[in-house]
Amino acid sequence: MNPVESFVFPDIPKTIRDVLFKPDKQMIIVGVIGKSSNPTCNKLIGFNLLTTHPALTDSKCCEGRIKFYFENDGNVLYLHFETTFDQQVMAEQLAKAIDTGVQDNFVNFNSYVRSRFARMLLFAIQVCHMIVLVEPTSVFDTSYLSIFKSLKIIREKYVLKFLPKLLKASNVGNYMGKEARLCSPRFIFLFEGTCDIKPEDVEKLEALECAVEEDIYKMLRTEFIITNNSAMSLFSIPRSKKFVFFSSDSKAKSDPLLDSIDMLMEYLDKPAAGQQGDKDEEEFMNKLRPCAGYGMSAWSVGAGAPKTERERSVLTLIKKHVAEAFEHGFDDSVSKYRGRSHFAVPGFKSWFEGFKFLHKIFIENPDNQNYEPVDVDYKAYLENFHKVIDIDERFFADVCEHGMELAMVNYKEMLPHHYSGTFHEKKYQQARELFLRYARGPEVEKHELKLKDYCDSIWLNGKQQCEYPSLRGNPCALGKHKANDPMDHSSGVVFVSACNCGRTQGHREDPYTIRQANYEFYQLIAKSCSNCTLLERIKFPVFEPSSSDFRAAEFINKNLSNLMSLENSNRTPDTGTHPPMTNDHSPHLSGSQKSQDSASNLTFSIDDKEENETHAKNYASQGDADEALEQENLNEIVIKVGEHADQTDKEKAILRQPSTTEYLPGMLHATSPIGLLPQFPSWSLVCLGPSSIYTHNSGLPEHIQSGFLSGSNFLLPWDVSVRLEHAQSWAASYEKIRNRKKNVSQSKSSDSSNNFTLKIFIGIEYECLRGHRFIMSGPDTVLRGGSGIVRDSGSKVVFNDMPIYFPCLCRNSNVAQLMRVHIVTPKAPVNVILEPKAKIFQNNMQSNFTFTTGQPEPIKLTQSAYWILRLPFVYEGDEGPLMPPSEVNASNAAMHGILLAGMYGIKESEISEELL
């Protein structure tokens, strides 16, 4: 018969049943549980109890399996528990979790492993007298403390409520008493890990064991896992006996297959048989035997001297405790609680019946998902076991909840009545960052979604801002509302702008309609201006309904409409920079009517943009002497006076009559349908008064033009030399009147009758949203007032495209916009004419719109007067407003929009003595 028998619960071989189920068979139950690092998961290897290595006999390990071991001549039953703390079992469970995806993170998997182990440990505490906790290292795993503490809570709160009732109802386990267990089991801690102490140095090993015992005892007492009353403790610790053992036996981690290979190699390296001594040969052969006496005769086995048991082994320590259990039982209580502890050693048959019942209560039923407990206390145990054991999940849930609370408070701090989605996202990100400082574990994503939903609910429940964009791109600051009219919106942004004449500055609300931006504000501020309502002005074409039944025009193919209308119109589609529209018989300057003596081909109305830029560069690069000569030739023009246009030309010049039932919904631009006019003008042209208002020595006075930055309130002089041809009668009349006023004889003035010089003052004014105004002296140069102001000429702004947007000189680097053109006309028998065109680029100059005033002919300005042309504040294309750039610099200003060159011209006027 094998000295050590074993079987796996619940299958008991008949031969073993006959031995164990004897009526007088009493045994001390020793549970072996903990961790193992070998593939068989067998933790009894280091006990020196097994005659054969488990790797040669045991099958594959399985989580939850309980194997019984006992000696035929002994009275100790060893229960070997295979749990999730065994390395091989844990690896299999991990692979299964990865394949199924049940545990999607480490914390959940670790929680599962701890919960399964704790359930088996609690069951062992109920059915064992002693428990050996095996640790494959030399260090105590302090994570056991949380498991012990949780099991103590579970036992006191749930187990002691339902288990006595169930035991009584089942008529099994009467020997367990009111504590529903054999006794308070005594724990032995076995460490199989190697340490620096050699096995021969027994004293040092024992000193180490004593030190570890003291540390473990303190930790268990501190956590109240053991108390003075062992009956109220989860388990007990012996008061005067060892309960910690450091194993120095290398067999615990040996592999028989590898050992056999090593011995075979050693045997092959030895001398031939017969050449070594009999004693050495016998020792080597004993190593090869799988168990003692294997392959030897019975006489040989019995003939040897009895082998004495090793003095230092964990099995020896266990048997000492077993002897105490049989003699006195375990009473590890302190002082007044001694003698009150329950200790029972029932017959094996009675114990086994109770074991099966408790196994069903603690192991089988929790694994059965369809099991419905009848007892309320037992049901509470099943529902709350994992919650109590799983301190990691509780910890992570608590820190997530704490972080969640702080994040919620952070989000709600200093919230305005209404706020935008951008502000909401910013506040949420701040709250999220605070949450992530505290939150840890698998619940982070779940709580993060809850935080997102919470913040969104606050924002959407009465805090959401309208955010409808203004024409300047600013969102509406009001709460979410349904607006029937864009005027119902308000961004709360206030700008500073000057009126049409520039005399008065006022605050304006951020516009939401083109009418509000380009018309209504200027009508409103005109009431506060002492000038605007009294000034002479040019009226631009607007829609005039013939009845109350009118509507906005709807058109699909604008290009087709334009091509059809161009045949009956003298307006040309936008192809770049256009000259003022003239003909050979027109009495004003055309694009080709230049002096033959002029070296350049530049005119007021420039035919070619590249030609304009070439001459502008040449002009800028010449010296002072050449500059004067070039300037004289550049600004010399020829006016040919012909007969009035005949009837045919007049008919040709007549445009299609505008519609009186449909109006243009947007702003006029070069490709707008012919015959449609807007409801209001986006441009303004007013006469500020006589030319004497402006004095070039002092510039624009503050009381006439407010808000100009220092040194930039000067207009630019533009000297134009005019030569008359084929107009003797016109020139003679002009000279006669002029000489009569000057008392000069006609003969003296005849030589100069065909030549005279005009001085025109031009100012291209920019205005930022804070009301800062300044004049520019060139496409990329801001006018700087000073002693050199006379040297700056208006030619640069006349013959070059001027940017619509330019950086302001103020601290905030705001974007200034071209808002006004100042023209001081000369006192001469000619009229300055204007045909302004503003080209706005979009999508990196991939598309553009050229906006016009809608006048069929260039605008004629009166002589000797100060005129101000106010440009639109906002430009709107066919698909909506054209947003100004958020930032701009001098190098890329022209990429966003330009005021096309060629907007100025000269036309003859009637001669009168009042003029001269």
Curated annotation (Swiss-Prot):
It comes from the Eukaryota. Residues 589-604 have a biased composition (Polar residues). Keywords: Nonsense-mediated mRNA decay. Pfam families: Smg8_Smg9 (PF10220). Residues 566-626 are annotated as: Disordered. One of its GO terms (biological process) is nuclear-transcribed mRNA catabolic process, nonsense-mediated decay. Involved in nonsense-mediated decay (NMD) of mRNAs containing premature stop codons. Probable component of kinase complex containing SMG1 and recruited to stalled ribosomes. PANTHER family: AMPLIFIED IN BREAST CANCER 2-RELATED, NONSENSE-MEDIATED MRNA DECAY FACTOR SMG8. Belongs to the SMG8 family. This is Nonsense-mediated mRNA decay factor SMG8. It comes from Aedes aegypti.
